[in-house]
């Protein structure tokens, strides 16, 4: 079987909903990343077999193909867009790696993009062509049958209650995320991930959701979103805009082209769970991944779990017995942000730049009751 390696990875800084990137369509968010790869890896770009991107709340119309054309890549390069909700970006990386393993191609660009600010409004179509009632807008599509399709906030509350994750633990984890993120922005670790872009004449190179100077006590002052609950705006991620691209190729070709380091894809798993508890998906996903590769949690140096809500990450940490020295060691989405279709690819990008780590996992909890996880080693 061929081996797939990630040899390059970059992302935009993530803008908050209605923030600096609010006027940019998904293809415009991706364009500078494509152009960066085109300029830096010109010889490789001509060999691309496919572009695979995750996207969740966009306009449809295969954003992967549209974006590569917008960026001036060759007409002969195809593109495919994947929607596995929040797991789309990680799914895109796994898809490209699996295609290389299967011998279907040798060079792929994978990643994801999301503009929550530019997401189209959704209106239910009337049952009758003679309908006279006012249009009915809705926030999102259904992820599961009606009685098993909680809002994401209610889903986080369900997980918190089931796994006994207190408000205090949630706030403490959120504070940790902001502190670790701020620390790794300051020391330059996170800046390695980010390609600075120019937006309206200004350089944009810092995640907008980060609140590095909020005192710990302030997290406890936020009211729960649901009366009597524990999930607040402070221990939940924000809605965000941003894009991520990774260059993935067959290992022997990577060596031939002069790439000397990166991530080797070992395996990936996707599972289903009770859709009332969507955030717990990483638990069986990571467990199955470890079992299939004859590993234990202690064998993994770094585990990146997307921080949609403190409640679900703390629950996963406790269920899997993950130590703080393993989990989200540069912070996470509670501070950096969660651009849905790009977030899984961002986790892999973060692992790519942890040059001193050898064995790593990226995992996502997914709306509708899913979880995915991927195992990487350094090459």
UniProtKB/Swiss-Prot annotation:
Group of enzyme by EC: transferase
Keywords, comma-separated and alphabetical: Acyltransferase, Transferase
Signal peptide annotation: none
EC number: 2.3.1.-
SUPFAM superfamilies: Thiolase-like
Active site as annotated: 86, 338
GO molecular function, one term: acetyl-CoA C-acyltransferase activity
Name of a matching Pfam family: Thiolase_C
Stored CDD domains: thiolase
Top-level taxon in the UniProt lineage: Bacteria
A GO CC term assigned to this protein in UniProt: cytoplasm
An example Gene Ontology biological process: phenylacetate catabolic process
Record family assignment: Belongs to the thiolase-like superfamily. Thiolase family.
NCBIfam families referenced in this protein's UniProt entry, alphabetically: AcCoA-C-Actrans (TIGR01930)
Identification of the protein by name: Putative acetyl-CoA C-acetyltransferase VraB
Biological source species: Staphylococcus aureus (strain MSSA476)
